[in-house]
Amino acid sequence: MSIPSILRKETLKKKDKNIDLQENNINDLVVSASRVIAPLWPISTFAAHHPWMGLEKQSFEQVANWLKEARNVDIYPSASMIHSAKAKGEIEESFLQIALSRWLDSQSFHMPRETAERFCQEALKLERLPSSLLSSPELNKLAEEINYVNTGSMKDSSMQPISSLIENQNGDNLSDILNYHIIKWCKLYLDDAGTSWAMPNREKGFYRAWQHLITFDPALSKTERKVLKDWPEDALIALTKALSELGISESNMQAYLEGHLLSLPGWAGMIRWRSQQSIEEQELLIEYLAVRLSMELAIVKPYLPLKNQKAEKKVSIVPLIASWIYWGDISIEKWLQMSATEQSELLAFAYRFDENTRKKLWLEAWEQTHAEQLREKIASKQRATNDKKRVVAQLAFCIDVRSEPFRRHLEKLGPFETFGIAGFFGLPIATTELGSNDSHPSLPVILKPKHQIKELTDENECKSYEQRKMVGSSVRYTFKTMKQNVLTSMLLPEVSGPLLGLQMVTRSFVPRRVGGFIRNLRKNMLQKPDTTFSLNHVHDTNCEIPIGFTKEEKVNYVRQALKMVGLTEGFAPLVVMCGHSSQSTNNPYAAALECGACGGAAGGFNARVFATLCNLPEVREALSAEGIKIPDDTIFAAAEHKTTVDELEWIYVPELSEIAQEAFDCIEAIMPNVSQHANRERLMQLPHFKTKIKNPSKEAHRFAEDWSEIRPEWGLARNASFIIGQRELTQECDLEGRAFLHNYDWKQDESGDILANIIAGPGTVAQWINLQYYASTVAPHYYGSGNKATQTVTAGLGVMQGNASDLLPGLPWQSVMQSDRETYHSPLRLLIVIQAPTKYIERLLNNNFTFREKVQNGWVRLASVDPEGRWKNW
């Protein structure tokens, strides 16, 4: 029953003495230790990230137990969440009993099964043991009398930083003091917001810049500065020396580094992300640890050596005995009458059926209830695949869960067919918009762009547009410069006060009107001319990636996307590629609402590029030769789904054929109705909307324009499943905006490559999004980002609470919570449902080790629906 660190490097030999390590050994240790944190993208390019992406070789249960032990972080839903879900009918008691029975079958014990079951049933009520019982003299005396019971295998073996074990004379924990210093230095080094006073020697790297300044830091004592005065100039040597002087043995080094990375997972995550972006900063994580451990040594050195530093903490048997008294109805008198063997058996069983195990069973029951409800919903609405109505237009939306209600209402109100596809449309591009010199990756962050696409227009039009744009940029730049300058910042309130005061009043009391006025003013001033794209391949040695596509690449990307969604025949007169974006004001998390997968890149640019490619005669001719015949009167257009207001904005409408024009007019006529229905459904889910909304679209625009609105939309909250299959599988099903939907036709995927690509790409993205929402819900203090209203945007990187907290890695409280006590997001691991024959799923699992590992270790759930409609849980 020991709980060793599951992340300790297996190849290290256990030694009790301090040793000097080779540089490559330290490098390997840092790489291995870095698995416990996830890269953290800057908030301006916010990307959903799976907090435990480096730990998937361990099971979800193992990681949950390790985090509970190492950091006291609980990643299972709390008792209040579970009770609330049960009250709302989200957990069926029968599934809990099945989970309990399965757990008992896996255990070895010698007591009567009914005794074990009775104990477990009471414990599963998730009631806390009474404090009066835990502190009772009789119980503690009993624990002392039976302390000979063998609990040697029940030990806490986590490796905590030494600073966390020490308090100074003021009662302050030294790890808190260390964190304060590290946060300060991280902010100084990582600040890319263009501050007037940059960190000196920043170009030499984090460690060297810190070393040049640390001996002048007035926040350190003279003794602490003296320790660091002649410290090594090389980060790797400094890290090795700090580990040695702290007395960390080789066998404990990785666990010790993990402990430090987990102390500030946000800042460490940002450091890790930066280290992956350029060769110049690839050693940044080593430098961070060198700074952190060097400062730890300086702070704790007066307290070294610690007495009993290596003493192992034994598990207290008091709560174990109390649990049998309270839940097992075994009195103290009965305990005294038992043999040592019987006592040991009961204690061991109570130890195994701990709080994490109980919550694990509840989570499994919650997830199984959701799977069964989804199965019943799909089964009740299944239609024959040949029962298709005639459609005048086909619209392809992002798999994003916010597309599901919009698609459902669109199909219900008109003769339309919709598809689900990853919102970058399979185009691995970096985009450069008109008037900009900077390119932005416009694809999921797990991929790298292979082509650069520039927006082009007539030279004179471009100059005129750039001049208009420069006016606005100059005003913003002047304001920012004045704000950051020591002298002009005192004058700024006098100069800008009246204007900003007027803005504050109008924005607060008439947000929709003012927001609309500002948006229209900006649109008129910055009216973008008609543009084209650099679609044709150009060899430019100054560009890291090629500009445009070759003919073969154009055909390949179009073919790949059309086959991925099964659209290779039966084209409607009008096919619309719909990217998505959001609309909010004064929102640090605006990028997260745009697209959590693509680093805040809206999908309109990609949609327009893809539609343009589909209209090229050369592409159509090549596809026709391969059997994909697009009719001459079928036109591809592009639009953008505004998720905050549920509107469709046209961004590319070429010259339409007569029949395509009719389809376009049909969409235009029905769209206001679709928006009203979709907005009503979405707004009713927000807090404080208990009555009927008279004008949903008007109310949605108010939410989007109100700069005091902390929850303009729910984002991807309540996401729970990823359904891969034909639209007929879920058509007419009200999936409540909880499902990622990706079209897939197994009959067109004989090799299984399309399914494998969906799982590797969109499937991974959906899992990351799901687990970020999960983590931000179950452990908001560690993996979330607190209350939006009290956040501080820091150094252009992310948010903090106050000015000296960790860089908060997850989603704000308002993204997952309905109220202070009620969650909105249901913390369930993603259920992937694939519509395909069983042999397709077996082949997928056999060929894709990474995905099989995720399923086996409990990071995702998997189910399938075969051609006859039979559901199977894997």
Curated annotation (Swiss-Prot):
Disulfide bonds: none
Family affiliation: Belongs to the inorganic carbon transporter (TC 9.A.2) DabA family.
Pfam family for this entry, one: DabA
Primary role: Part of an energy-coupled inorganic carbon pump.
InterPro entries found in the cross-reference section: DabA
Main location: membrane
Subunit structure: Forms a complex with DabB.
Molecular function (Gene Ontology), one example: zinc ion binding
Chain sites annotated for binding Zn(2+): C398, D400, H580, C595
Cofactor(s), by name: Zn(2+)
Highest taxon above the source species: Bacteria
Subcellular location: Cell membrane
UniProt GO cellular component terms: plasma membrane
Organism of provenance: Bacillus cereus (strain AH820)
Protein name: Probable inorganic carbon transporter subunit DabA
